[in-house]
Amino acid sequence: MITATLKGIELRLETAPGLFSPRAVDAGTLAMLSRVEFGQEDKVLDLGCGYGVVGLVAARLGRAERVWLLDQDPAAVELARANLAANGAGASTVVLSDGFRSFFETGFDKILCNPPYQADFAVPKHFIEKGFNRLAVGGTLTMVTKRELWYRNKITSVFGGVKVSEVDGYFVFEATRKTTQYAAKRLKPRSRVGS
């Protein structure tokens, strides 16, 4: 059991040794939360929720029934459900899914993610590309990582731009869905002279 006060909300959280950051709320998650404001009507997705910190904060600051939490780990999903119930946000929805593969909800105002650090970027690529499609036009993807260049380039290629903030050694990326198509698909092909 850990305790944390986030955005003025005191939380008691059950964790487990096999999950990410079981002894304290991760510094990257804290950095990301420092850049986000939740509104009462926001439809929010905590993508890769772990034991549910981000989704729980969103549910307590907004309306719990407008918050979804998603993770591929059954233990994380179970703990997220328990933590939501124990902290007065049991109306939120927790889903077991490998990324968006078994999750089809759309129209999110905010998708927040602290993706796993891997060498091949397959997971964050999936989260960015499929996350774009799950946002409402005007919705925002917020991600936090320790690496900047790949994420900046990938998010820009999908969203057409990204705001990057450095917070306590982490990079927080905020990108807004402005249209219905990826930025790269909106670019017109260049004509080649002499070919």
Give the positions of each predicted feature.
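Conserved helix-to-beta-strand junction in the class I
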Residues: 87, 133-135, 158
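A short glycine-rich, Lys/Arg-flanked "PGG" loop and its adjoining helix->strand segment in the class I
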Residues: 125-137
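Core SAM-dependent methyltransferase catalytic element
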Residues: 168-195
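Short beta->alpha hinge that forms the Motif I/post-I loop of the SAM-binding pocket
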Residues: 71-74, 123, 146-147
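Conserved beta-strand signature within the Rossmann-like core of class I S-adenosyl-L-methionine
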Residues: 138-145
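Class I SAM-dependent transferase core
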Residues: 1-39
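Class I S-adenosylmethionine-dependent transferase superfamily signal
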Residues: 58, 131, 155
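Conserved SAM/SAH cofactor-binding pocket of Class I
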Residues: 27-113
